[in-house]
From Swiss-Prot:
Pfam families listed in its UniProt record: Tubulin, Tubulin_C
Compartment(s) of residence: Cytoplasm, Cytoskeleton
Record-linked SUPFAM superfamilies: Tubulin C-terminal domain-like, Tubulin nucleotide-binding domain-like
One BP term from GO: microtubule-based process
Record-linked InterPro entries: Beta-tubulin_BS, Beta_tubulin, Tub_FtsZ_C, Tubulin, Tubulin/FtsZ-like_C, Tubulin/FtsZ_2-layer-sand-dom, Tubulin/FtsZ_GTPase_sf, Tubulin_C
Classification lineage: Eukaryota, Viridiplantae, Streptophyta, Embryophyta, Tracheophyta
Record-given protein name: Tubulin beta-2 chain
Binding site for GTP: 11, 69, 138, 142-144, 204, 226
Organism name: Eleusine indica
Main location: cytoplasm
Name of encoding gene: TUBB2
Binding locations of Mg(2+): 69
Family: Belongs to the tubulin family.
Keywords on record: Cytoplasm, Cytoskeleton, GTP-binding, Magnesium, Metal-binding, Microtubule, Nucleotide-binding
Length: 448
C-alpha cells in the first residue's frame, strides 16, 4: 500500500541516495543481501512502502538510479548496500553532462531519458497504490539538475495526480564546486516551481556548519553531510513506514504546508543532531527536542528563519512520548515566538508522532518549515546569475547545446517573481487581506 518510488540522479543524488538506503535498510532490519534479519514485526508491517518483495523472500528497494557517467554508479554498486538494488534499475550513459544543464536537459540526458522512464514505469506497475515519487538530486551540476528536472516533468505528464517530492541540494553561498552553478540552479528552480509538489531545500554550507559547530567535526566529509540528509529523509516518511498515533503522508504534508502552490520550498531540520558513529549519552526530553528542532542553527539550508516568517511548519516526532506533551510544546513555541509566524494562518504548525525511534536514539524529531526567509537562497543565486548573464559569460556552452537566451531570461524572471511572492506574504498582515478582498468584490461586481 502507499508505495513511494525513489529516484536518484547525478553524482550528488546517487551519493545521498545510497546513504538513505543504508538508513532505511537498517531501520527495517534488512541486510545488504536483501534478507530480513530484524527482530520486530513492526519492521515488516509496512516494509512495502520502499521495498518490493521478490519471490525468494528478498527485499528489493523501489529505487531507480540514473547518471550520465558510470563512475558514481560503480561506487554505489560496490558500496555497502550495492548488491541490494535491482541491476536493471541502474541506468547510465557514458558521456557525462559536464556540469552543463543543457546537456542534461536537452542533449545527453534526453537520449537516456526513455530508458529511465521505462524503468520507472516498470517499478510503478509493481505498486499496489503508488503514493508518489521522491527524487534526490543537486541543482548545481548537469545531470541531477538538467536531467533530474527533465525526468520530473516527464513523470508529471504521465502521473499527474501523484505526489512529487524532491530533496534538492542547492549551490551553497561560499562553497562553490563549479562556476556555472547559478545558471544550472536557476534553470532548475524554473522547472521545480512548475512541476514539483514539495521541495526539501538542502545545501552543503549549512550542513558543513552543522558538522563543524554542533557536531564538532573538524574536517567533515561528504559522508558526514549525507548522514545528516539521510536522517531527515528517513524522518519525513517514518509515519508511512511505522505505526504512529498521528500519521502523516506526502499528501497530508503538502496540504498542511503549502498555502500557495508556487511556495513549496521547505527548510528541513533534524534533532537531536548526532555525528556518524557517536551515540547519545543521555535521553532527550520533548522540550529539548522541540527547542533544538526550531533552532536556526539546525536548518539544513543557508537561510535564517529569523529573517522571515513561517507560513506553515510541520514537526514529526519519533519515539515513545505523550502526544499531549508534544502539542503543549508546539503551542508553546508558537506563543513565545508569535512574531515569526504569519498571523493570517491560525494553527499553522502540524505535528505527527510515530512510535518507532531511529536506530540508537530514544526519541527524535524532523522539522519541515515553509518560511519566507528561504527567499534569501533564491535571491543569492539570482544575484550570481544576473552578474554572469549580464556579460553573457559561459553562455556559449548552453546555446551550443541548442538552448535559447530567452530561456535564461524566463528562468531569471520566474526566480525573481518567486522571491517577490515570498516577500509579499512576509509583509502581509491580517488587516490588509480584508482590504484586498473588498477590492476583489468590487471587481467581481464590475465584471458582472
Amino acid at each position: 500500500m502507499r508505495e513511494i518510488l525513489h529516484i536518484q540522479g547525478g553524482q550528488c543524488g546517487n551519493q545521498i541516495g545510497a546513504k538513505f538506503w543504508e538508513v532505511v535498510c537498517d531501520e527495517h532490519g534488512i541486510d545488504p543481501t536483501g534478507r530480513y534479519t530484524g527482530t520486530s514485526d513492526l519492521q515488516l508491517e509496512r516494509v512495502n512502502v520502499y521495498y518490493n518483495e521478490a519471490s525468494c523472500g528478498r527485499f528489493v528497494p523501489r529505487a531507480v538510479l540514473m547518471d550520465l557517467e558510470p563512475g558514481t554508479m560503480d561506487s554505489v554498486r560496490t558500496g555497502p548496500y550495492g548488491q541490494i538494488f535491482r541491476p536493471d534499475n541502474f541506468v547510465f550513459g557514458q558521456s557525462g553532462a559536464g556540469n552543463n544543464w543543457a546537456k542534461g536537459h536537452y542533449t545527453e540526458g534526453a537520449e537516456l531519458i526513455d530508458s529511465v522512464l521505462d524503468v520507472v514505469r516498470k517499478e510503478a506497475e509493481n505498486c499496489d497504490c503508488l503514493q508518489g515519487f521522491q527524487v534526490c538530486h543537486s541543482l548545481g551540476g548537469g545531470t541531477g539538475s538538467g536531467m533530474g528536472t527533465l525526468l520530473i516533468s516527464k513523470i508529471r505528464e504521465e502521473y499527474p495526480d501523484r505526489m512529487m517530492l524532491t530533496f534538492s541540494v542547492f549551490p551553497s553561498p561560499k562553497v562553490s564546486d563549479t562556476v556555472v552553478e547559478p545558471y544550472n540552479a536557476t534553470l532548475s528552480v524554473h522547472q521545480l516551481v512548475e512541476n514539483a509538489d514539495e521541495c526539501m531545500v538542502l545545501d552543503n554550507e549549512a550542513l558543513y556548519d552543522i558538522c563543524f559547530r554542533t557536531l564538532k567535526l573538524t574536517t567533515p566529509s561528504f559522508g558526514d553531510l549525507n548522514h545528516l540528509i539521510s536522517a531527515t529523509m528517513s524522518g519525513v516518511t517514518c509515519c508511512l513506514r511505522f505505526p504512529g498515533q498521528l500519521n502523516s503522508d506526502l499528501r497530508k504534508l503538502a496540504v498542511n504546508l503549502i498555502p500557495f502552490p508556487r511556495l513549496h520550498f521547505f527548510m528541513v531540520g533534524f534533532a537531536p543532531l548526532t555525528s556518524r558513529g557517536s551515540q547519545q549519552y543521555r535521553a532527550l526530553t520533548v522540550p529539548e527536542l522541540t527547542q533544538q528542532m526550531w533552532d536556526a542553527k539546525n536548518m539544513m539550508c543557508a537561510a535564517d528563519p529569523r529573517h522571515g516568517r513561517y507560513l506553515t511548519a510541520s514537526a514529526m516526532f519519533r519515539g515513545k512520548m505523550s502526544t499531549k506533551e508534544v502539542d503543549e510544546q508546539m503551542i508553546n513555541v508558537q506563543n513565545k515566538n508569535s512574531s515569526y509566524f504569519v498571523e493570517w494562518i491560525p494553527n499553522n504548525v502540524k505535528s505527527s508522532v510515530c512510535d518507532i525511534p531511529p536506530r540508537g536514539l530514544s526519541m527524535a524529531s524532523t522539522f519541515i518549515g515553509n518560511s519566507t526567509s528561504i527567499q534569501e537562497m533564491f535571491r543569492r543565486v539570482s544575484e550570481q546569475f544576473t552578474a554572469m548573464f549580464r556579460r553573457k559569460a559561459f553562455l556559449h556552452w548552453y546555446t551550443g547545446e541548442g538552448m535559447d537566451e530567452m530561456e535564461f531570461t524566463e528562468a531569471e524572471s520566474n526566480m525573481n517573481d518567486l522571491v517577490s511572492e515570498y516577500q509579499q506574504y512576509q509583509d502581509a498582515t491580517a488587516d490588509e487581506d480584508g482590504e484586498y478582498e473588498d477590492e476583489l468584490d468590487g471587481q467581481e461586481e464590475e465584471d458582472m
